Each structure stands twice: as structure tokens, then as C-alpha cells.
């Protein structure tokens, strides 16, 4: 782990070896590469009714656009990390760029639900890869903090920006906002580390089994008996495969690293808590304060922005802290937020609670990612980032479902 907030991480850029040891990709390029992913997650919330109206469909039908993006980032995160690990940064970047560009063209030019779903999925696959690449190329706590802060900050403002794009251009333009990440590709390519020598052969069986497991887990909150059974079956087969292929798509060195498992599990919990709070808060505020949907949206924006922006400084400030310290700090912040929300339904208290859970999730994502990458052997950094981000994204998927179940 780094000795200061500006010192390089040991494994963050692995497996690529830096062409010039003292230089890396500027953090601003990495933040621009990663941040627009959040447009695909949160951006459609205010423009889906317009899409449903123009397409002559129900709101439930057009939500498949968002579902496709969520599924794609879940499976794309480990798949694109595997591509980076085996083929290097350049090929992974160009593949992700092609997917994002194709997806943007589909959602902008073909106003039909199948095209919109395919385009959203393509953008999800590409931006998932961009985010994993960005996090694996960070070289200090400050750069990791900037990357994760960009994800949180864009996510907090995405609904309003997408709605504005819909008013000025079209709702299809709002769905194409993840393509803004393409602006960072030339800069990252120019400063990228040298591509690695070829590693172990690609493991197609491991990739298929992990994709099946992730797909099942994504649908557990929506159809838990079937999806849960499928997840157990896929997980069992993947575990058996891991025993016979230790250097496969999911390296044994990662799943046997205690710090990696701890930080990934905590990232899941922080994401589930934060996104569960985001799901519950609008109804609580509307009921307690009698606010309109617009007033609720404007009120929630500020604690979410606070969490995203403040996380940059928190990650830098905790760069030298031991794993045990951050493992207690960020879950403690999230627990404090949940406790406040349970103790009082005052709008001010609820917004403070959201600010705490947002800060915990955004800061924890960056701080835990750095420690997860440093906990695995050389050559496994990019794969570790893919698996770590997968845990965080699964938490984001489970959080609202858990919150809905608790709410009755």
C-alpha cells in the first residue's frame, strides 16, 4: 500500500508494465473514462416516460433499456477485465470503444425497443470495461479517489443532465450520454502502459461459467427461486472448474487473498446500503414533507453530490490507514446513516443519513479497490479490479430489492 496519497500503488496497473516508471495516465483522463458509466445507470430515470410515450409502449416495457444496461455492466466488468489481462490495455480500450460507439449509434438512430435494448447493452459492456481499465491504471490514492468520485458525482447529476439533453435534443440523446467516455480514449491510449507479454491461455469455460453466475445473481432480486437455484449451480460448477484451472478466468490467487475477499465483500455491503437508501428516500421525503417529485429530486441531489465530491479527499486522507481501520470506518459511516434514518423521519435527518451512506459507498469503493488490487500477485491487478467492481455492482443491484422487501 502506498506510503502517501500520491505514492504509486503496487499492483493497480498490473499486468501491464509501465513504459516509463515515473509516468502514468493522468487521473483526469481516467476519471473521464470511468465517470460516464453512471449516466447509463441513473440517467434514464426521468426520460423513460418520454420514451414510452413516443414508442407507444408501457413504462414497464421500456425499463428493459435500463435492465439491459445493468446486466451488461455486471457481466462486462469481469469479461473486459479478462480481455485486458490477456490482450493488454490497447486492445481492451479499442474493443470497449467500439462497443460504446455502436451502442450510441443504435440508441440515437433506431427508435425501436429491440434496438434501444441492444444499444444500451453494448454501451454497458463498453463502459464497464472502461471503468475497470481506469481503476486498474490508477497509480495513487488521489487518482483512485478522482475516478470513484467521478462515478458518484456523475451518478448524482445524471437524471437532471439526461433530462436536459432530452429537452434540448431528444430522449434518445439522453440514453447516449455514456458515449461521453469516448472523449478520454485518445488520452488514455497516448499515456497507456506497455502491453504485457502473453500470459496463460484464455479460459473460455471459466468465462462462460462466471457469466452464467453473474447473470443469475443479477436476476435473484426479481425471481429468486429460479435465479437462486441457477446461481448455486453455476457457482458450484465454477468452484469445481477453479480447482482444475488455477490460472483460469478467475485466478485462484485472487479468491484466496483474504484482503481481497474482505474488501470486495464490504464494497458489496456499502453499495447495497447506499442504493437501498436511494430507493427508499424519495417515498419517505414525499410522505413526511409533502414535497413534489421535483422538490424531492432536487433535495436528494445534494447529499449524493456531497458523497461523491467529498470522497476524493477522504480516499486521499485514508491512503496510509491500515486495512482494519478503513474496514471499520466506512461500514461505520453507512451504519450511522441507516441508524439515523431509522430513528427519525425528519427530512433534514433523512438527507443527512443519505449523505453518510453516499460518502461511505463512494469512499469505500475507492479505498477498498486500492487495497484489493494491492492484495493480489503481480499480473492479476486488472482481473482483481474486474471482480471487485462486480461485487460493488451486485450490491447496487441487490440494495433496492432488499430495501423494497424491508419496506413491506
Regions found by a protein language model. Give the residues of each.
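Intrinsic disorder in cytosolic terminal tails and internal cytosolic loops
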Residues: 1-23
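12-transmembrane solute porter fold
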Residues: 22-52, 59, 65-69, 73-84, ...
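Cytoplasmic-side transmembrane-helix entry/capping segments in multi-pass membrane proteins
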Residues: 90-95, 141-153, 199-208, 254-260, ...
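Membrane-embedded alpha-helical segments of multi-pass transporters/permeases
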Residues: 105-109, 186-191, 238-239, 339-343
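Transmembrane helix interruption/hinge and helix-loop junction motifs
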Residues: 109-114, 220-228, 343-348
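Cytoplasmic helix-loop-helix junction between adjacent transmembrane helices
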Residues: 119-151
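A gly/Pro-rich, aromatic-decorated transmembrane alpha-helix motif that marks the paired
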Residues: 149, 153-169, 394-406
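Hydrophobic transmembrane-helix bundles of small-molecule transporters
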Residues: 156, 163-265
Amino acid at each position: 500500500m502506498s506510503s502517501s496519497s500520491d505514492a504509486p500503488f503496487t499492483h493497480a496497473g498490473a499486468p501491464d508494465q509501465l513504459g516509463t516508471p515515473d509516468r502514468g495516465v493522468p487521473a483526469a483522463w481516467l476519471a473521464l473514462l470511468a465517470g460516464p458509466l453512471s449516466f447509463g445507470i441513473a440517467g434514464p430515470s426521468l426520460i423513460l416516460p418520454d420514451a414510452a410515450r413516443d414508442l407507444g409502449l408501457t413504462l414497464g416495457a421500456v425499463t428493459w433499456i435500463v435492465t439491459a444496461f445493468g446486466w451488461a455492466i455486471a457481466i462486462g466488468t469481469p469479461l473486459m477485465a479478462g480481455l485486458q489481462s490477456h490482450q493488454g490495455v490497447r486492445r481492451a480500450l479499442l474493443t470497449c470503444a467500439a462497443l460504446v460507439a455502436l451502442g450510441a449509434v443504435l440508441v440515437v438512430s433506431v427508435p425501436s425497443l429491440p434496438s434501444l435494448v441492444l444499444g444500451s447493452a453494448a454501451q454497458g459492456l463498453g463502459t464497464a470495461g472502461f471503468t475497470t481499465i481506469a481503476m486498474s491504471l490508477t497509480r495513487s490514492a488521489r487518482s483512485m479517489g478522482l475516478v470513484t468520485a467521478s462515478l458518484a458525482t456523475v451518478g448524482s447529476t445524471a437524471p437532471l443532465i439526461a433530462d436536459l439533453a432530452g429537452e434540448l435534443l431528444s430522449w434518445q440523446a439522453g440514453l447516449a450520454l455514456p458515449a461521453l467516455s469516448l472523449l478520454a480514449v485518445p488520452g488514455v491510449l497516448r499515456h497507456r502502459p506497455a502491453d504485457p507479454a502473453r500470459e496463460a491461455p484464455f479460459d473460455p469455460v471459466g468465462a462462460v461459467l462466471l457469466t452464467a453466475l453473474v447473470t443469475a445473481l443479477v436476476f435473484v432480486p426479481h425471481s429468486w427461486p429460479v435465479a437462486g437455484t441457477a446461481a448455486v449451480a453455476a457457482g458450484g460448477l465454477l468452484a469445481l472448474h477453479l480447482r482444475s484451472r488455477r490460472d483460469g478466468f478467475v485466478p485462484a490467487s485472487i479468491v484466496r487473498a483474504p484482503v481481497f475477499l474482505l474488501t470486495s465483500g464490504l464494497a458489496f455491503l456499502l453499495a447495497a446500503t447506499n442504493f437501498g437508501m436511494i430507493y427508499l428516500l424519495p417515498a419517505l421525503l414525499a410522505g413526511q414533507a409533502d414535497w413534489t417529485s421535483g422538490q424531492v429530486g432536487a433535495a436528494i441531489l445534494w447529499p449524493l453530490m456531497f458523497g461523491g465530491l467529498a470522497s476524493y479527499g477522504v480516499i486521499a486522507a485514508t491512503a496510509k490507514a491500515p486495512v482494519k481501520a478503513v474496514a471499520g470506518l466506512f461500514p461505520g459511516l453507512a451504519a450511522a446513516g441507516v441508524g439515523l434514518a431509522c430513528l427519525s423521519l425528519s427530512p433534514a435527518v433523512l438527507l443527512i443519513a443519505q449523505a453518510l451512506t453516499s460518502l461511505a459507498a463512494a469512499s469505500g469503493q475507492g479505498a477498498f479497490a486500492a487495497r484489493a488490487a494491492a492484495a493480489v500477485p503481480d499480473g492479476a491487478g486488472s482481473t482483481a479490479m474486474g471482480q471487485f467492481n462486480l461485487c460493488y455492482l451486485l450490491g447496487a443491484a441487490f440494495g433496492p430489492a432488499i430495501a423494497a422487501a424491508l419496506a413491506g
